[in-house]
Structures are given as structure tokens and as C-alpha cells.
Amino acid sequence: MTDKNTRTEKIQPFSAPKGVPDYAPPRSAAFVAVRDAFITQAHLAGFEHIELPIFEETGLFARGVGESTDVVSKEMYTFADRGERSVTLRPEGTAGVMRAVIEHSLDRGQLPVKLNYAGPFFRYERPQAGRYRQLQQVGVEAIGVDDPALDAEIIALADRSYRSLGLTGFRLELTSLGDSNCRPAYRQKLQDFLLNLPLDEETRRRAEINPLRVLDDKRAEVREMTADAPLMLDHLDDGCRTHFETVTGLLDDMGVPYEINPRMVRGLDYYTKTTFEFIHDGLGAQSGIGGGGRYDGLMAQLGGQDLSGIGYGLGVDRTILALEAEGVTVGQERRVDVYGVPLGQAAKKAMAGIINDLRAAGISADMSYGDRGLKGAMKGADRSGSLYTLVLGENELDNGTVAVKDMRAHDQQDIALSEVVSALRAKLA
């Protein structure tokens, strides 16, 4: 007898954590298309893949990215593991690549070392459209050569990566942040300017630690106060100026359009000289879809050789949003070439063997499961998007054949079971 007062509590389903997007079909097709297009372009330019850990020692990012950055001071997912070691989910890729290059002595061979990576990165930000706590990125790093031609190659590669997807409504902004020779004098001049402004306590602290960070502040009141701030482009020494002019000249020669933005400051401290960002105005506030720059000095800062480097990170999530804003469709829903419809247990056993043989021959194939009749199973075939459907019942088994239905031409023929794989391979060639 059931107690009237007994209530069965409904089990609540789980949801993804806030700010962590799922890419489920059919949208996952766009995700794969964008990621793979970026990787393909990198491989065409001679970059080799490197697979990095999802988490690293916290000190790697504190030292490499910069303790005064928002990324390190506010946005990192940092925790103590069971051994009481401080580890951090990677917020960006360059520091991890440099750590791996140093650890595995990849910089002791031919230079530049050209590596590409892809995967998720993690930042504790306020979630909104285009800004996620888990962001997907494809990046490249070229390490060991201080050559403006390499800067131009990297920028052109990023530009070509976007255009390979059919994306057109973006623009490239670039500047130079100088180097250790000319930046200190500019830094002092900028700091003197900023400390004479009525800044709030946090912004003043940032101006004292790294005044360039203040120019990266997106608040309207801060941007208004810093409108007349001195600019790095006006304080480059001859070497940095020549480097930057060579980069822009090479981009002109390659037909890569760009705009010079003297106020640009990237969100990471390691950048020097050439710095760039790709902007898409169809995304609202989160308009940056990718960017990068040169980071001479980072390797030495992390305990390696004093070698230069340059790279970029292209945002997969925001690129998908940019494509959607332009009405550009990339990727196709995954379909199988062949779908099997077995009618009865004996047919199911035989069909499983056929499907396995088709897959072994490199033909994508699936089949109907359960005990659905012909009508229900054919609905599954239609939904699969298959080009051919195999129908196998008692009559076909007795005759040693299978009915092969062309789903586009809507015709059907019987083919011997022993020949079905070769016949379908010929039809799909």
C-alpha cells in the first residue's frame, strides 16, 4: 500500500556550467569546419602540431603572461591539487608552447621552430555572447628568428585563414609596442602622464605596475582621460621603426589590408614590436576574433635561450559568430554514405557483418537498430541522409542478395551479398 504522503522527488537534470558552451549537432559541424580550416592553413605554411596539457604550474602564467594582466590577476582558474601544488587551467597557449620548446630542446634544431595548437582555454570572465569561460582557439608560434618577413607571414596566414572560410567583414589592426631598448623611456613618460590623472585606486595601481595596461582599459571614463596619452608609435627607436615599416611594406606587397591603431594594447604583457588584432564589427562589444604579435624576451624570461618569437591565437567561437552574422554557412551535418535496414534477427546478424565490411573499406555506414518494421526503419534511413540504403529480409537472405536503394535516384537493384562492398565502392567513387 502506497503512503499518500510519500512523494517521489523528480531527479533534476544537469546543465553545462555557466559560460561553457556545448557544440551539439548541427552547429558542431561549423565548429569542426572552422577549427580544421585554421589547422589546414597552418600546416600549409609548414607548422607542425603540438599537443599541450590542459593545466600547467601556476607560476608559468604568472611569470610569462604578466601578474598585472587581468588574465592573471582576475581570470585564471587556479587550484591546489592533491599534492598541494598550485596549478592553473591554461588561459592562453603561448606560455605553454614556450615551456614545451624549452623542456624538449626543440629550439636546438632548425629555426624557426614552427608549431600550431588547438583546443580549449579557460578564463573566469563575465559570460556573454562571444565571451565564454571555456574558449576554443587555434594558434601558431614561430620561434627563433627576429625577421619582419616572419611577422608578415604570420599576419598573412591569419588573414588567409579567415578568408578560406568565406569570411570577409573583418579588418586587421596593427601597431608596434617597441622593445626593451625604446620602451622603458616611453613607459616612464606614459606613467608620469597617467599618475597625474584622477584615476581610481585600482587603475592607479595598474599604472604603477604596468602603465600600458591602462591604455587597454575599456571603460569610457578612462578612455576619455587617456585620449591625449603619449603613444608608443611616436617613441620607437630607429630599429623598431624600421622593423615595423618593413612589416607594413611586406603586407602591402602581399595585398593584405590593414589599419594602424597606435592605441592598441594586447591583454598579455609579453608582446613586443609587431602586435595585431582582427576585428569583426558584427559581433558588438566582443569584436575581436583573433590576434597576436611578437614576444621577444619571453623564452629567456621562462628560463630558456634568448630567442625571439611571434604567433597568434584565432578564436573559433567568435569566428563562428562572425560567420553567422555574415550569413556564411560552413561545414555540413555528418551523414553516412550507406544505411542498412535489416528485417528480422537473421538479417540483423548478416547486416552487422556487411556494415563492418563497408567501414573497413573506408565507406561510412550505419544501420537500423531495435525491432522496427520496414516503414520505421526507412524513416531512419531518410533522416540519416545516406546516399544508399540496403534492405535485407528473408527473401534476400534466401537468394544471397541485398536490395540496394539509391536515395537520390529512387531506384533499386539487387546485388549479391559477396559483391555489395565492391559495388558500393564503385558507386561512391
Curated annotation (Swiss-Prot):
A GO BP annotation: histidyl-tRNA aminoacylation
Record keywords: Aminoacyl-tRNA synthetase, ATP-binding, Cytoplasm, Ligase, Nucleotide-binding, Protein biosynthesis
GO CC, any one term: cytoplasm
This enzyme's EC code(s): 6.1.1.21
InterPro entries associated with the record: aa-tRNA-synth_II (IPR006195), aa-tRNA-synth_II/BPL/LPL (IPR045864), Anticodon-bd (IPR004154), Anticodon-bd_dom_sf (IPR036621), His-tRNA-ligase (IPR015807), HisRS-like_core (IPR041715), HisRS/HisZ (IPR004516), HisRS_anticodon (IPR033656)
Catalytic activity: tRNA(His) + L-histidine + ATP = L-histidyl-tRNA(His) + AMP + diphosphate + H(+)
Main location: cytoplasm
Coiled coil start-end: none
Entry-linked Pfam families: HGTP_anticodon (PF03129), tRNA-synt_His (PF13393)
Broad enzyme group: ligase
Location in the cell: Cytoplasm
GO molecular function, one term: ATP binding
Gene3D superfamilies in UniProt: Anticodon-binding domain, Bira Bifunctional Protein, Domain 2
Superkingdom of this protein's organism: Bacteria
Subunit structure: Homodimer.
Sequence similarity: Belongs to the class-II aminoacyl-tRNA synthetase family.
Protein name (Swiss-Prot/TrEMBL): Histidine--tRNA ligase
Record gene name: hisS
